């Protein structure tokens, strides 16, 4: 979790930094490793990259930053998040708990946005064991799941519309 690239960082909100070696290549006896780094929301990429650069240089390598996309995060105590959770709670009868993940999201490309989608505890997988999970082959949901999600989205949009953002 970051030690191998010189930045073993973590925070309480999003946990430890994660990174994967997505693509390796070699050209003219130069090995290139492309890393996808997901750093905790309380850190800044421009603060972490010099540390990565120095760590890689110690090993005789060179680090090049292709691009940096800041994490997408909105605290749970904001009116927007409270509104989304209230819609979830109303439809499901359960207490929704927000969480952060290291994954990329479309919400990074919009001001004042978060990724929001219901995950219903205990709802059976209509595709069977090992299939149909989010972002996996044969991703699927039941009509009941989709209708429940639609109700949450409608109530969420009405609630967000009533906020003065």
Mark where each language-model region is.
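Flexible, glycine/charged-enriched surface loops at secondary-structure junctions
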Residues: 2-13, 60-66, 164-165
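A short beta-alpha structural unit
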Residues: 20-25, 34-41, 62-81, 87-89, ...
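Short amphipathic alpha-helices in soluble, non-transmembrane regions
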Residues: 47-57
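Midchain, well-structured core segments that form catalytic/ion-binding scaffolds
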Residues: 1-43
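Zn-dependent metallopeptidase/amidohydrolase metal-coordination segment
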Residues: 27, 94-163
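A short small-residue
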Residues: 32, 62-67, 129-137
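Generic secondary-structure signature for well-ordered alpha-helical cores
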Residues: 1, 57, 61, 89, ...
């Amino acid at each position: 979790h970051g030690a191998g690239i010189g930045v073993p960082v973590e925070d309480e909100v999003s946990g430890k930094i994660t990174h994967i070696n997505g693509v390796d290549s070699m050209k003219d006896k130069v090995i290139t490793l492309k890393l996808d780094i997901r750093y905790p929301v309380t850190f800044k990429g421009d603060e972490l990259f010099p540390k990565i650069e120095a760590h890689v240089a110690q090993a005789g390598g060179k680090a090049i930053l292709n691009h940096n996309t800041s994490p997408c995060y909105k605290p749970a105590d904001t009116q927007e998040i409270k509104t989304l959770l209230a819609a979830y709670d109303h439809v499901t009868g359960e207490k929704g708990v927000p969480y952060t993940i290291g994954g990329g999201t479309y919400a990074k490309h919009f001001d004042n946005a978060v990724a929001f989608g219901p995950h219903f505890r205990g709802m059976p997988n209509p595709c069977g064991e090992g299939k149909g999970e989010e972002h996996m082959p044969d991703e699927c949901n039941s009509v009941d799941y989709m209708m429940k999600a639609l109700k949450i989205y409608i109530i969420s949009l009405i609630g967000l519309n009533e906020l003065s953002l």
